[in-house]
Amino acid sequence: NVLEAQGDELRRLIDGASAGGATPRLIVCTDCESLASVSPLAAPDIIVFDESFTDSQVPFGAFAARRSLLRHWSKRGMTIFHSTTYQPNTISTLHMLHCLRRARPDFMERHAATLARIARDFDFRGRVFAERYSRSLARLIRTVGWHETEVKTSGHYVEIGGRRIFDGVGGVACSIRGHNPPDYLAEIDRLGDPQACREELAARLLELTGLAHATPAVSGASAVEHALKLGLASQYPRERVLVMRGGFGGKTLFALTGTWKTSLRRGIDPLYPHVVYVDPFAADAVTAVESAFERHPIGVIQCELVQGVGGVRPLPADVLRCLAKMRDRHDCLLFVDEVQTGVYRTGPFSRSAELGVQPDLLAVGKGASDMMFPYALTLHSQAIEERLAARHCDLAAVLRSRYDYELGMRTLLNVLRHAAERQLPETVRERGEQFQRVLGEMLRGCGNVREVRSFGLLIGIELEAGAGFRRWLSRVRQQLVLLAMLKHPRMPLLVGYCQYEPHVLKLTPPLSITEEEVENVCETISSVLRLPLSKAVWAGLRPLPKTGSLKSREITI
């Protein structure tokens, strides 16, 4: 109501600033109830939709923007800039539609014909997607032949037009037992009383991590933000964060503190300024860490034990020992980001436990969702809790009230029970060793493969990058490799590359992958990587085999 009354004044201020050479944007945040009043406001540039559109039952967020602003997300190189741009949570989105149908039946009725056509007409769907969402992503979908095909997921496979493709990405390390676990609803329902579930989850997490306090989050990036906020609040006035270069904290504003790649931070300054970066792979890394503590009041150390986005590279043991020593010597906090390595991805619940490292702060995500709803968690020590209490800081309680939702909590508890019952750590370790052994044997002598690195079921295959023209040729070949694996005649495989290191093929299969599937996936990878360039071109660019008529399949909205 206040914004509606002041709409004309806001627009006048913006026009005045624009006349002075600035280009401010008006961003309006709306809930479901006030949606109808947005249009006559001061013609906002961006409209943000909050979780009231899902009755605050599951995480949801979206925005609409002027075409001139949204164009930035569609230009070359931005197609998969942010994971939620190309893989929004389907269940949360469908729930939003159901809630909107109840709350605004007039709106849904007004657009019913368009929605029905989107559901049944692939060509129309593609045009709307390109115009309203992302032209570059629409082009990518056409390139891989998915633009006129119904896509389904079940277990370890994505089915496209009747053709099953093994999902070796799984939301980039989210997949515990594949897509759409058939018993999920019954398992969640059997967990019983919510308070009893919370107490059991807390007890299990304490046993697994040694950390007594948990703060829920709705993404890995928000879990990283929680950790940094809690850590720095307890360490005040020490405001410096020591970050290992090559890390990836996420793409929200504070999580970018731990995201090393400058191109991901460019253009959205100012970010948190009190950050010191050290290259953990440099020959003088230990000296650089010690020097950073001599020059700066370090409050929090942030690191990943395996840099998943940065090439599936483990933090050197001597650097890790140095960080632990500096933590103890200078009474700072060790924050280990295990959003990608945690929840059994490398075998145990956390790689920290496997390496004998006791963090003060620990972020987990990905697998915590069971590939269903977005969920993540920040764990912190009793010492941090006591420091916050002594400062009368209620930040942890505020974050819990904002980010907690029952279904996410139940989902993680169900994952922990599932892992214990099926001895998941041992299974993941065995499958990881199998991948390392079989890929090592199959790729031995392959000229364009430098190394295979396996940490449980977080696997990187480093290819020759080359330089100059050879580097350009390698990049072209690498894209053809992905397409050739996707179109493999016996075991089609969906896989990707590391974002920082595009010459490192990255595989994050479901933790429930079978021995036979490991063998078949390795055979696909080996057969494609051994192709000469001319055959790789044909294998990557040949049309996808078609199964039946794909023009008029329907989906339900």
Stretch-by-stretch model annotation:
Residues 17-24, 326-330, 446:
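Helix C-cap/helix->beta junction micro-motif
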